[in-house]
UniProtKB/Swiss-Prot annotation:
PANTHER family: 50S RIBOSOMAL PROTEIN L36 2, LARGE RIBOSOMAL SUBUNIT PROTEIN BL36B. NCBIfam families: PRK00831.1, rpmJ_bact. HAMAP family: Ribosomal_bL36. This is Large ribosomal subunit protein bL36. Keywords: Ribonucleoprotein, Ribosomal protein. Belongs to the bacterial ribosomal protein bL36 family. One of its GO terms (cellular component) is ribonucleoprotein complex. GO terms for biological process: translation. One of its GO terms (molecular function) is structural constituent of ribosome.
Length: 41
């Protein structure tokens, strides 16, 4: 999982990427390509 300041550019890397909020943190998740996981930090 990558830790990035801005997730907007990471979301555009794959069409299945989703931005979700969990426990006050913002994540990019992808059900089909797991390597696109990222967290904002």
């Amino acid at each position: 999982m990558k830790i990035r300041n801005s997730l907007k550019s990471l979301r555009g890397r794959h069409r299945d990427n989703q931005i979700v909020r969990r426990k006050g943190r913002v994540y990019v998740i992808n059900k089909t390509q797991k390597r696109y996981k990222a967290r904002q930090g």
